[in-house]
Amino acid sequence: MKIDTIRNFSIIAHIDHGKSTLADRLLEYTGALTEREMQDQFLDKMDLERERGITIKAQTVRLTYRADDGNDYILNLIDTPGHVDFTYEVSRSLAACEGALLVVDASQGVEAQTLANVYLAIDNNLEVFPVLNKIDLPAAEPERVKHEIEEIIGLDAHDAVMASAKEGIGTREILEEIVKKIPPPEGDPAAPLKALLFDSWYDQYQGVIILVRVIDGTVKKGDKIQLVSTGRSYEALKVGVFAPVMREVPQLAAGEVGFLIAGIKDVADAKIGDTVTHALKPCVTPLGGFKEVKPMVFSGLYPIDTAQYEQLRDALAKLKLNDSSFSFEPETSLALGFGFRCGFLGLLHMEIIQERLEREFNLDLITTAPTVVYKVHRIKGDVITIESANQLPPLQEIDYIEEPFILASIHTPNEFVGGILSLCEEKRGVQREIKYLTPTRVMIIYELPLNEVVLDFYDRLKSITKGYASLDYEHLNYRRSDLVRMNILINGEAVDALSLIIHRDKAYYRGRDLVSKMKELIPRQMFEVVIQAAIGAKVIARETVKALRKDVLAKCYGGDITRKRKLLEKQKEGKKRMKNVGNVELPQEAFLAILKVEEK
């Protein structure tokens, strides 16, 4: 196969702009799938991907296409995840391509995540050309959207392909553009093997399957290969391509995209962005851009039924097989029992994992409030990182605490700007800029503490803007902040699962809301229950759940006041004793309340 007949490309699009449907049409047109095999969103393998209409893992497929110039071309479509949490995975998938189709919904225009991914593509020197999808919709405004693409992204859009993936309009034109506009890969088949690993997953029969793009050299069955970041060697047991079902091939040469199965046991060894080379004759310099993915958001997962603990552990281990960016370790809580502390890339990643646990493994879970990674500088000069309030050292040992900040860019219709600005200010944001992209669309850029974003920022942004705003963020740095640990005390006992790290300025308001919410949820006992929010020894808010009491004076018709007083005193004594020995059962809702306390 000649290297100049290969085209490697990916499709960049915002959620719901029609990326997976377009991929379906390309598969159908090039005859990769028969009518019988065709199902909607063929490349999205997980039910969850189909349902939410998002792509979570990268997939590849090889198409063969006879172009108008009479030549046969091999087109490798690399399907990338489009969501902000998976930015690193996207950048590695894009590094495997020479070009990209920018698919924009002709009725909605350019969105924040599209923009982030286009910039990633441009950073990787990809040839990007625009495709306007959904032109069959009555609300489509192709001219306005073309103008937006030119204004916002700076791409020439006058000859953008008009398409409707649903109706199959424009599919052939797109294939022709791919052949004409995207350059063939460059690479030397005779050089030592150098290949980019851009995705991996676990198959229970064959071990870890890795997707690679060969940059230089060739790899064939039986070769000894090495992964550069770990230095471990394996034997290539199978070499092949997805067309779109797995098919073995004799070898993969420079410029080609395919899969390798090499008896790798653990997906954590096959790191995305790693370089694959020959063990005996390695390449001199590995590929650049590799970095270890670290979880940014942490949350505790506990089974509601403690008998499901083992099942939860097995389920987490299974998910980890396919997702090395997810981490978990056991933890115990006095209030919730045994569970796990899990680390995620971001909020969407967290939601997807929780939903998969509940759906695929039938588990009922309680999730504690999400937290981020803080850096605590201690007085003795060392720095420790913590993910939960319970790991915070005593106040007298702490010099200062740093928290992570992100740079958020929010795209929104202009009528919602006021609401978004006040939301960002309330979340301790620092305004960077406000840019009018078109007379009706605005881009707002803010620096925000990640701690404030993980709780409910995204939901509130969507409700303020009726779902029209889109959010994209990147991690900036760590900054010094006045953070404190707030404890919730029930009858003087701190409840570990309810502690949280919070900014001092907000602690009073949050504490007050929390204790009043808890007062509604804790059922009345035979003795009074005192709920307090405290920072260190200082109580900042308090509520009391009054005791239930029997009417002890019912049997005294008239009689002396001292008799009544004696009975009341006796009852009071009894209640006091009870309070010392009684313990309060906290209902499950009390923990969920913490997650749902809206900051006023």
UniProtKB/Swiss-Prot annotation:
<dbReference type="Pfam" id="PF00009">
    <property type="entry name" value="GTP_EFTU"/>
</dbReference>
<dbReference type="GO" id="GO:0003924">
    <property type="term" value="F:GTPase activity"/>
</dbReference>
<keyword id="KW-1003">Cell membrane</keyword>
<keyword id="KW-0547">Nucleotide-binding</keyword>
<keyword id="KW-0342">GTP-binding</keyword>
<dbReference type="InterPro" id="IPR031157">
    <property type="entry name" value="G_TR_CS"/>
</dbReference>
<comment type="similarity">
    <text>Belongs to the TRAFAC class translation factor GTPase superfamily. Classic translation factor GTPase family. LepA subfamily.</text>
</comment>
<dbReference type="InterPro" id="IPR005225">
    <property type="entry name" value="Small_GTP-bd"/>
</dbReference>
<feature type="binding site">
    <location>
        <begin position="16"/>
        <end position="21"/>
    </location>
    <ligand>
        <name>GTP</name>
    </ligand>
</feature>
<dbReference type="InterPro" id="IPR006297">
    <property type="entry name" value="EF-4"/>
</dbReference>
<feature type="binding site">
    <location>
        <begin position="133"/>
        <end position="136"/>
    </location>
    <ligand>
        <name>GTP</name>
    </ligand>
</feature>
<keyword id="KW-0997">Cell inner membrane</keyword>
<dbReference type="InterPro" id="IPR004161">
    <property type="entry name" value="EFTu-like_2"/>
</dbReference>
<dbReference type="GO" id="GO:0005525">
    <property type="term" value="F:GTP binding"/>
</dbReference>
<dbReference type="InterPro" id="IPR027417">
    <property type="entry name" value="P-loop_NTPase"/>
</dbReference>
<dbReference type="GO" id="GO:0005886">
    <property type="term" value="C:plasma membrane"/>
</dbReference>
<dbReference type="InterPro" id="IPR000795">
    <property type="entry name" value="T_Tr_GTP-bd_dom"/>
</dbReference>
<keyword id="KW-0472">Membrane</keyword>
<keyword id="KW-0378">Hydrolase</keyword>
<dbReference type="GO" id="GO:0043022">
    <property type="term" value="F:ribosome binding"/>
</dbReference>
<dbReference type="InterPro" id="IPR035654">
    <property type="entry name" value="LepA_IV"/>
</dbReference>
<dbReference type="InterPro" id="IPR013842">
    <property type="entry name" value="LepA_CTD"/>
</dbReference>
<dbReference type="InterPro" id="IPR009000">
    <property type="entry name" value="Transl_B-barrel_sf"/>
</dbReference>
<dbReference type="GO" id="GO:0045727">
    <property type="term" value="P:positive regulation of translation"/>
</dbReference>
<keyword id="KW-0648">Protein biosynthesis</keyword>
<dbReference type="Pfam" id="PF00679">
    <property type="entry name" value="EFG_C"/>
</dbReference>
<protein>
    <recommendedName>
        <fullName>Elongation factor 4</fullName>
        <ecNumber>3.6.5.n1</ecNumber>
    </recommendedName>
</protein>
<comment type="function">
    <text>Required for accurate and efficient protein synthesis under certain stress conditions. May act as a fidelity factor of the translation reaction, by catalyzing a one-codon backward translocation of tRNAs on improperly translocated ribosomes. Back-translocation proceeds from a post-translocation (POST) complex to a pre-translocation (PRE) complex, thus giving elongation factor G a second chance to translocate the tRNAs correctly. Binds to ribosomes in a GTP-dependent manner.</text>
</comment>
<dbReference type="Pfam" id="PF06421">
    <property type="entry name" value="LepA_C"/>
</dbReference>
<feature type="domain" description="tr-type G">
    <location>
        <begin position="4"/>
        <end position="186"/>
    </location>
</feature>
<dbReference type="Pfam" id="PF03144">
    <property type="entry name" value="GTP_EFTU_D2"/>
</dbReference>
<dbReference type="InterPro" id="IPR038363">
    <property type="entry name" value="LepA_C_sf"/>
</dbReference>
<dbReference type="InterPro" id="IPR035647">
    <property type="entry name" value="EFG_III/V"/>
</dbReference>
<dbReference type="GO" id="GO:0003746">
    <property type="term" value="F:translation elongation factor activity"/>
</dbReference>
<dbReference type="InterPro" id="IPR000640">
    <property type="entry name" value="EFG_V-like"/>
</dbReference>
